[in-house]
């Protein structure tokens, strides 16, 4: 699915190649762990270029929509001119750094689980972009069942942060808990489930934070399984 922040980063990067503008504000997203559905960016540019910028955005909308091949039927890019006005905007360097970071930072699924090829192993999401009085905050959700892969994604974000002359802060963490192909307790639990309920259980991995990861981090020789409820609706 298309992340609105990443799409906006691409649009701004493309526009910056042909037009001079400064960002006034950039905002969007509701939660760090939810793929952003919208991004609203306000820029200030030469009024004489307003129509050309709007036309360029229309062209980018057509290009990006065709790339999704119908998977994002409601994707829409709109450029609205507010006329001549005086606004406080980012300087040229900050504008370039925000665009470069938003467009260049890694996002989405990074790799799948080798034991379960259809299950995501490592991913991250550009969830919230927020402009305050003198700061742009970009919030990510970073997840992996492999601790070293988690570190690798964070290192890449750190690099992008350094290149943008920005700072970063980690708040909250989901310890990794990898699939154990040699688990002793799992086959026993499967057999017990069949005895109790007369059917095969569904055995799968989940791409999310579980308390098991915290326990495993404290004692990594544990053999752990987790049970989840049946969810409907």
Indicate residue ranges for each PLM-predicted region.
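C-terminal catalytic subdomain
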Residues: 136-154
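Short glycine/threonine-rich loop-to-helix capping motif typified by GTGT followed
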Residues: 32-40, 93, 178-191, 214-218
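Generic long, charged, amphipathic alpha-helical segments
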Residues: 164-196
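Redox- and metal-dependent alpha/beta enzyme cores, enriched for Fe-S-associated oxidoreductases
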Residues: 148-167, 176
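A structural preference for short, hydrophobic beta-strand core positions in alpha/beta folds
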Residues: 25, 77-81, 168-172, 203-205
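Generic, well-ordered alpha-helical scaffold segments in large soluble proteins
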Residues: 11-14, 56, 60, 156-160, ...
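Midchain, well-structured core segments that form catalytic/ion-binding scaffolds
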Residues: 1-142
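Zn-dependent metallopeptidase/amidohydrolase metal-coordination segment
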Residues: 114, 121-123, 127-134, 141, ...
């Amino acid at each position: 699915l298309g992340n609105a922040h990443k799409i906006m980063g691409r649009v701004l990067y493309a526009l910056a190649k042909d037009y001079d503008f400064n960002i006034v504000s950039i905002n969007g997203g509701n939660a760090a762990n939810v793929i952003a559905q919208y991004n609203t960016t306000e820029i200030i540019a030469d009024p004489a270029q307003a129509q050309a910028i709007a036309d360029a955005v229309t062209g980018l909308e057509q290009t990006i929509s065709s790339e999704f091949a119908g998977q994002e039927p409601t994707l829409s890019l709109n450029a609205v001119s507010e006329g001549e006005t005086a606004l406080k905007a980012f300087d040229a360097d900050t504008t370039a750094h925000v665009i470069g970071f938003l467009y260049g930072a890694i996002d989405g699924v990074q790799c799948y689980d080798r034991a379960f090829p259809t299950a995501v192993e490592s991913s991250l999401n550009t969830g919230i972009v927020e402009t305050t009085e003198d700061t742009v905050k970009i919030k990510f959700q970073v997840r992996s069942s492999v601790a070293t892969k988690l570190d690798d994604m964070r290192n890449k974000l750190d690099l992008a942060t350094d290149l943008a002359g920005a700072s970063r802060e980690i708040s909250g963490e989901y310890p990794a808990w990898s699939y154990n192909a040699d688990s002793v307790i799992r086959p026993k639990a499967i057999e017990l489930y069949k005895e109790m309920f007369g059917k095969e259980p569904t055995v799968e991995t989940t791409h999310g934070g579980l308390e098991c990861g915290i326990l495993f981090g404290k004692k990594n020789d544990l053999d752990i399984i987790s049970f989840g409820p049946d969810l409907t609706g």
